[in-house]
Amino acid sequence: MGPRSSNRRSNAKDGFKGSNKASKFPLPLAMWDFGHCNPNACSGKRLERLGCVRNLRIGQKFRGVVITPNGKVPVSPADKEYFDNGGASVVECSWARIEEIPFSRIGGRCERLLPYLVASNPVNYGRPWRLNCAEALAACMYIVGYPNEARLLMDNFKWGHSFFEVNEELLDIYAQCHDAQDIQEKEKKYLEEMEASYQEQRNQTTDDIWSAGNLNHKPTLNTSSTHSNSEESRSPLHEPSEASLAHDEHSIPTDDNEETLTNLQANDVDEDEVWRKIVRMKVHSTDT
């Protein structure tokens, strides 16, 4: 009785709903699990326990869509035939140990990247391309034409609804594309418009500051209270450092442990500068 009670507390703490969800899933989903993550905080293991995802052996290939950094193009509606023949699979591993993964011994015929999307999981909320396994599988299903099943999968997580609140506009754009090239073009346009909007907001903010007059004569704010709430008031688009994203061209679905999260936070630099660098990096990468 003791361990069972402990698991319930751990699941509640990590944002997982109870075990009263359906134990099977209507579409075939799989993962290669490398055991890097905390089992109680791992979305892939959670889905495996619920019977939604099956675990693949190292050396076993997958005939459906494989979300992997070995992919050359993003997943698109054109991959629906592959999905219908085999489903979707992901790699369950830690960002911090990505170099340990034997990618030559896993994968399949339809290896794909993920286009620009923003994580909503508790570990990497608001970080582009930092999707975990559940989010990556949901994104794949949504893009190839199974939005209802994507939502059904994310219903297994207390925070799952936020993935669509954050990404629904982009997911709808991608789902209406014809193929990978179309998705790359839409992704590039979206990022360019996002950067332009960001720069416009920055310029307006600067104009407001100068129109306010001499700020030395204005009353000062209580900086201690502002600082204490800085984590809560961060923008959902708060970015990790460019160095922490240098190894992932688009996305690999993973679940991070506390050590990885600490490293990412330690590498954070000026938010404005990181925003510009990362958006430009992604825009330029679609030209190559």
Swiss-Prot record:
Q: Which reaction does it catalyse?
A: an N(1)-methylpseudouridine in rRNA + S-adenosyl-L-methionine = N(1)-methyl-N(3)-[(3S)-3-amino-3-carboxypropyl]pseudouridine in rRNA + S-methyl-5'-thioadenosine + H(+); N(1)-methylpseudouridine(1191) in yeast 18S rRNA + S-adenosyl-L-methionine = N(1)-methyl-N(3)-[(3S)-3-amino-3-carboxypropyl]pseudouridine(1191) in yeast 18S rRNA + S-methyl-5'-thioadenosine + H(+)
Q: Which residues fall in a coiled-coil region?
A: none
Q: What InterPro entries would the database entry show? A: RNaseL-inhib-like_metal-bd_dom, Tsr3-like, Tsr3_C
Q: Which GO terms describe its molecular function?
A: 18S rRNA aminocarboxypropyltransferase activity; metal ion binding; S-adenosyl-L-methionine binding
Region Disordered, residue ranges: 209-267
Which Pfam family is one of this chain's hits? Fer4_RLI
GO BP, one annotated term: maturation of SSU-rRNA
Residues at which S-adenosyl-L-methionine binds: 43, 91, 114, 129
Q: Compositional bias (Basic and acidic residues) at which positions?
A: 229-253
Keywords, comma-separated and alphabetical: Cytoplasm, Nucleus, Ribosome biogenesis, rRNA processing, S-adenosyl-L-methionine, Transferase
Kindly list the places in or outside the cell where this protein is found, as annotated in its UniProt entry.
Cytoplasm; Nucleus
GO annotations of cellular component type: cytoplasm; nucleus
Ranges of compositional bias, category Polar residues? 209-221
UniProt-listed Enzyme Commission number(s): 2.5.1.157
Keyword Signal carried by entry: no
Q: Does the keyword Nucleus apply?
A: yes
State the source organism's domain of life.
Answer: Eukaryota
Query: What is the role of the protein in this entry?
Result: Aminocarboxypropyltransferase that catalyzes the aminocarboxypropyl transfer on pseudouridine at position 1191 (Psi1191) in 18S rRNA. It constitutes the last step in biosynthesis of the hypermodified N1-methyl-N3-(3-amino-3-carboxypropyl) pseudouridine (m1acp3-Psi) conserved in eukaryotic 18S rRNA. Required for processing 35S pre-rRNA at site D.
The record's similarity note reads: Belongs to the TDD superfamily. TSR3 family.
PANTHER family found in the cross-reference section: 18S RRNA AMINOCARBOXYPROPYLTRANSFERASE (PTHR20426:SF0), RIBOSOME BIOGENESIS PROTEIN TSR3 HOMOLOG (PTHR20426)
Q: NCBIfam families this protein is in?
A: PRK02287.1
The name under which this protein is listed is: 18S rRNA aminocarboxypropyltransferase
The scientific name of the source species is Schizosaccharomyces pombe (strain 972 / ATCC 24843) (Fission yeast)
